[in-house]
A protein has these predicted regions:
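Short sequence motifs at beta-strands and strand-loop junctions characteristic
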Residues: 8, 129, 200-202, 262-265, ...
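Interface/linker segment at the passenger-translocator junction
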Residues: 77-111, 120-124, 341-369
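Solvent-exposed, glycine/polar-rich loop segments of beta-barrel outer-membrane systems
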Residues: 242-255
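Outer-membrane beta-barrel and related beta-rich outer-membrane complex signature
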Residues: 68-72, 236-245
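Extended terminal
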Residues: 17-23, 30-33, 37-50, 56, ...
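Acidic, Ser/Thr- and Pro/Gly-rich intrinsically disordered regions
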Residues: 1-106, 122, 130-177, 181-199, ...
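Outer-membrane beta-barrel architecture
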Residues: 53-55, 112-116, 175-177, 221-227, ...
């Protein structure tokens, strides 16, 4: 109605006071309800500048992460407040097994108006696999280039994710760049509302530096270059995650399980290198009491498929060596896990693997460009 470029949203209601002065619109005392999220604040549109300039200072007492899903073409998983187009997108993703939606983004809106918008979300309601509890950011759009900086997300347990996002939409094929760092994030919070929560412990550090091009999230990830690095200095994971693959896989990985279904972890780390949408596992390992697990392989973000192997190297004496690897293949959304060729040898095996120098390797992994 006012010609303001904005993102697609779930159903919304807005109340407030609209003020008009020569060349200036002000929307004050505003209250917004977007999907299940709320916003309050002040919006100003200055028509005297060319292009027009929008300034907004917004606060949310409750921000439901799924209400941001339309920004990347995704659909909320909830059953209410979902448009027919969003529901169709979700059905297509589930049917194809794809991880990223290929819904074109309306980038032309970024060129229509310059903006300076801040949002302080006091409470974030996120999916169980994303342990964000609050966030604040500033979005500045100048001549088709959108910069989200600073971006800060507070995580359950005291951890944070900080960094910046940039989208250059001056051309028809936008360029997207992200640089984020994560620190002191409790691993178990990624498994909220699951049976793995109680047996999972440890704190994660990480760094994400990715750049890609495209008009949809699937296209951007399918052309991405850069890396994602993660490290866990110690803790435990639930043995139930591994047991889903069957007893043979459990034996092949040579894992020690405590009485409360924990697998003690001395160290874990991994680096995913992205090159034109192809992801390669680099220095990806899990150091446990009885063995060191090494992951090798690759994934394609164009076909959204993965093919990887996990090889266990024993640290000590064992009566049986399965001489096999665990294979992970299929769509990223739902891969299959199974054993490669296995040759049981009924002879004692003396393992030679050593503990990983966790602190030094973690420093190298997260410091690398």
């Amino acid at each position: 109605m006012l010609g303001i470029p904005g993102p697609p949203t779930p159903p919304y209601t807005i109340t407030g006071k609209l003020e008009r002065a020569p060349g200036l619109w002000k929307f004050v005392q505003s209250k917004w309800r977007v999907g299940e999220s709320d916003l309050t604040g002040e919006v100003t549109i200055d028509e005297r500048q060319k292009p027009e300039f929008l300034t907004a200072r917004l606060v949310s007492q409750k921000l439901v992460f799924e209400d941001l899903a339309p920004l990347v073409g995704a659909a909320p998983t909830r059953k209410t407040n979902v448009s027919a187009k969003q529901a169709q997108t979700q059905q297509q993703l589930e049917a194809s097994g794809d991880l990223f939606p290929n819904v074109p983004l309306n980038i032309e809106k970024l060129r229509a108006m310059n903006m300076d918008v801040t949002l302080d979300a006091k409470k974030v309601i996120a999916p169980p696999w994303l342990p964000v509890q609050a966030m604040d950011f500033r979005v500045v759009i100048l001549n088709g280039v959108a910069t989200v900086k600073p971006l800060t997300m507070s995580v359950f347990g005291g951890g944070t994710i900080q960094g910046e996002l940039i989208m250059d939409a001056r051309t028809d094929t936008p360029k997207v760049r992200a640089n984020l760092r994560a620190g002191e994030i409790e691993l178990k919070n990624f498994f909220r509302e699951s049976r793995y929560f109680d047996a999972t412990q440890g704190k994660i550090q990480g760094h994400l530096a990715l750049a890609g091009t495209g008009r949809s999230l699937a296209q951007v990830m399918g052309t991405a270059n850069g890396h994602v690095a993660l490290a866990l200095g110690g803790g435990s994971i639930s043995s139930l995650m591994v047991s889903l693959g069957g007893l043979q896989i459990f034996d092949a990985l040579v894992l020690y399980v405590t009485g409360d279904n924990r697998i003690p972890i001395k160290c874990a780390m991994g680096r995913l290198n992205f090159q034109n949408g192809t992801v390669t596992f680099d220095r990806t390992l899990l150091d446990t009491q009885k063995s060191v697990l090494y992951v090798q392989g690759h994934a394609s973000l164009q076909s959204q498929a993965v093919k990887a192997e996990v090889d266990a190297r024993r640290k000590g004496f064992d009566l049986l060596d399965l001489h096999g690897t665990v294979r992970i293949e299929g769509k990223l959304r739902n891969p299959q896990v199974g054993l490669g060729r296995v040759f049981p040898l009924p002879t004692p095996v003396i393992g030679t693997a050593k503990d990983v120098a966790c602190a030094d390797l973690t420093q190298q992994l997260l410091a690398a460009p």
